[in-house]
């Protein structure tokens, strides 16, 4: 079992590493490519676009051909794209490389969640996804620090060579450690069960909405945090970094505590707790009389996301044993596109950073609480499939 957990964690971590590792080198990248930092900030959106594009096909291929045939090309593409970015001499080529990086990371991301659905029952999967969420929270803190240390002695290109080496490690794991977990193709008698795993299932759609809104909350916070903390609240850059590190610490602590909480409380209770924390955060930020109270509200955001997201993802994947890849892709596309659409629309309409965050917190909590309380799971399918090792 440990091989599947290690491989799944490695496959997922390419996604945040690809986002956070290069940011510290952005000024030098812009200078070398004769582009402004503002022009290169679009690299974040381009990377997410690549991920979304990969998710359009990766899940279906993973369900038809297996997890390894998607993970291996995905990791290989991430390696090639990282090298391509390091060799880019224009901003256009650099952005093309970032799109390809997103494609590779997206393939790996989809496969990771499908593997966990294949190999773990509902309760264990919820615990593992909570742990995975905690580990993912480490990357935004450690990746920029690692990038800074690398750039003390090496040029910015070394950041992408480091990403390439990470991709090589994931490729080796996918080739030699990961075993195929895709359930055997259903016999004719099993076709009704395959057809019953509809993406239009009310319970699945409710969890798509909940997880998409939750991701929108956390990405809105990350996207607006420089404005909130430095421009509005007046913190210095060093203080901003310290606060973000502390929020990551809160996220990790809650994420690593959630598996123990699942041994005591029902998953539904933790999901309700998550949304109540979001609602409390929104109200706190809306009426905050001081910076200290606002910072407390921010910690509630991190705690709320960490306590509920892994549980919601596990519930979303639960109804799918034969179409776990497609379900994982659908979740990923909805989360990436939904959160990006909200941030873009809020910016176009002219909603300020503070109100943008408060608005999504309150909307997420109200909608999600209604869905949790009124959309019950249907008849469960097999909790997990026996792993068939394919020749």
From Swiss-Prot:
Key words, A-Z: Antibiotic resistance, Cell inner membrane, Cell membrane, Membrane, Transmembrane, Transmembrane helix, Transport
Record PROSITE patterns: MFS
Domain of life: Bacteria
Membrane topology field: Multi-pass membrane protein
InterPro entries for the chain: MFS, MFS_dom, MFS_Efflux_Transporters, MFS_trans_sf, Multidrug-R_MdtL
SUPFAM superfamilies: MFS general substrate transporter
BP-aspect Gene Ontology terms: response to antibiotic
Disulfide bonds: none
Transmembrane segments: 4-24, 42-62, 69-89, 93-113, 131-151, 158-178, 203-222, 245-265, 269-289, 293-313, 331-351, 356-376
Gene Ontology CC entries for this record: plasma membrane
GO terms, molecular function: transmembrane transporter activity
Intracellular or extracellular location(s): Cell inner membrane
Biological role stated in the UniProt entry: Confers resistance to chloramphenicol.
Family: Belongs to the major facilitator superfamily. DHA1 family. MdtL (TC 2.A.1.2.22) subfamily.
HAMAP family from the UniProt entry: MFS_MdtL
NCBIfam families named in the record: PRK10473.1
Annotated protein name in UniProt: Multidrug resistance protein MdtL
Species of origin: Escherichia coli O139:H28 (strain E24377A / ETEC)
Gene name per UniProt: mdtL
């Amino acid at each position: 079992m440990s091989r599947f957990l290690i491989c799944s964690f490695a496959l997922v971590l390419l996604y945040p590493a690809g986002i956070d590792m290069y940011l510290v080198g952005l000024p030098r990248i812009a200078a070398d490519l004769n582009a402004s930092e503002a022009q290169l900030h679009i690299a974040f959106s381009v990377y997410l676009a690549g991920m979304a594009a990969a998710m359009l096909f990766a899940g279906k291929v993973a369900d038809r051909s297996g997890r390894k045939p998607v993970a291996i090309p995905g990791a290989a593409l991430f390696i090639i794209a990282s090298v391509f970015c390091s060799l880019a001499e224009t901003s256009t080529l650099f952005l093309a490389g970032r799109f390809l990086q997103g494609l590779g990371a997206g393939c790996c991301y989809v496969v990771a969640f499908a593997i966990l659905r294949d190999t773990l029952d509902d309760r264990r999967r919820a615990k593992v996804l909570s742990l995975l969420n905690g580990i993912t929270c480490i990357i935004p803190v450690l990746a920029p620090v690692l990038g800074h240390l690398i750039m003390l002695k090496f040029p910015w290109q070394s950041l992408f060579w480091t990403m390439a080496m990470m991709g090589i490690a994931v490729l080796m794991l996918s080739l030699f450690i990961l075993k195929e977990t895709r359930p055997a193709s259903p016999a004719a008698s099993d076709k009704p069960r395959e057809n019953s795993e509809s993406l239009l299932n009310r319970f699945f759609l409710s969890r798509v909405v909940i997880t998409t809104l939750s991701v929108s909350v956390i990405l809105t916070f990350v996207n607006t945090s420089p404005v909130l903390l430095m421009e509005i609240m007046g913190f210095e850059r060093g203080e901003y970094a310290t606060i973000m590190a502390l929020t990551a610490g809160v996220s990790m602590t809650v994420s690593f505590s959630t598996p123990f909480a699942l041994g005591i409380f029902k998953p539904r209770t933790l999901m309700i707790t998550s949304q109540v924390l979001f609602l409390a955060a929104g109200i706190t930020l809306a009426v905050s009389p001081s910076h200290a109270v606002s910072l407390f509200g921010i910690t509630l955001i991190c705690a709320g996301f960490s306590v509920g997201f892994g549980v919601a993802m596990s519930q979303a994947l639960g109804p799918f044993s034969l179409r776990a890849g497609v379900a994982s892709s659908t979740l990923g596309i909805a989360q990436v596109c939904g959160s990006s659409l909200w941030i873009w629309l809020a910016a176009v309409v002219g909603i300020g950073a503070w109100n943008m965050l408060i608005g999504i917190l309150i909307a997420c909590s109200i909608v999600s609480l209604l869905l949790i309380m009124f959309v019950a799971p249907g008849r469960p399918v097999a909790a997990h499939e026996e792993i068939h090792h394919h020749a």
